Amino acid sequence: MLKSILVGTSLLAASLMLGRCGEKAEKIQDSAAFITIQGQDLIKPDGTKLFIMDTNLGNWLNPEGYMFKFSKTNSPRFINEMFCQLVGPDFTAEFWKAFKDNYITREDIQFIKNTGANTIRLPFHYKLFTDEDFMGLTAGQDGFARVDSVVEWCREADLYLILDMHDAPGGQTGDNIDDSYGYPWLFESEASQQLYCDIWRKIADRYKNEPVILGYELFNEPIAPYFPNMEELNGKLEDIYKKGVVAIREVDNNHIILLGGAQWNGNFKPFKDSKFDDKIMYTCHRYGGDPTKDAIQTIIDFRDSVNLPMYMGEIGHNTDEWQAAFCQTMRENNIGYTFWPYKKMDGSSFVGITPPENWANILYFSESPRTSYKEIRDARPDQMMVRKAMMDFIEACKLKNCVVQEGYIQSLGMK
């Protein structure tokens, strides 16, 4: 999971602007250079087993409110709208560029490597590969440029990378984490499904010969448990996954494809056919509960029934003692893991960002009623103060200024 790749740039611009990583990848043709599957194990090119350990680069290419300490303003779209209301679209675009340039850098990837990690999971928003408005850009999206950078940094650090479409077209979850409109429209929209397939085909075509990438996670945490037609949606899950696999296999037969369960990656009952592709592994998530084997027995039972690898793509936000105990449980049961997240404000991460001076004024605005133009005007604080606070955040998020959470890192048992 820590070998890298990041994604962004318009689909046309990417093929013209970023040949360097693609040219390197074209030189690698031997399928033996890639991670393979043997039963429930991942096998490295040298024949040894890979047990995934490390973290997620959450918030970087898919902003999430709570990592900024926002509450109501919790999705990428809501965050961007709030910033535009606060300081205008031009300054917001400047902020997003600086954010992407500084939140994750080569130094962060090397730091992650030094913790004993071997794999990084990279969550990204599908809009990074379209002309849609996202993080201050439209037609000039820089997704491929960002992923190319991470791939090179992971190569230098000897890490593997998992590409995770955290926010799919139409929304796959129906909550803030997929930046949707409150429903997983992906499962009912042919246009969204086509775009999802097209983006994965383009990503796979670019990286088809890149062994730093462990695999492609088609989308994150499908189908939240809030909907009265949940079982109907669950019944569509495997078919939507298969469409993505078919699109990828048109151009890439080298990489593993990761499939997550329904309802927070915890329900694997919708899966009826584990043999439709020979490079499939499954991924689960878990926050809270007992750190015991009994607590994840249904996941283990599914893994054993299909005899394919299972990996805990997200876990965290608990005490160091709980994390240490659960890591031991996962090691004993051959379930690799990447903790969520690597970096955010305050603790419960590898490194913490200290809120800059006057950030509380931005928090106040983010939580204030803004359903009318009058409410926006009345809540808006002093421009000079909040613009400085936003730029101070950029400085604060640099690794050199973050607080290393030593106990958290030690609890993961990677060294």
What are these regions (language model features)?
Residues M1-K27:
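Bacterial Sec-dependent N-terminal signal peptides
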Residues D30, I37-I52, N56-I256, G261-P270:
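Active-site mouth of glycoside hydrolases
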Residues P76-I79, L86-F95, A157-Y160, I199, ...:
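Low-complexity, flexible helical/coil segments
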Residues T329, G336-T338, K343-K415:
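Extended, alpha-helix-rich binding/interface surfaces that flank or overlap catalytic cores
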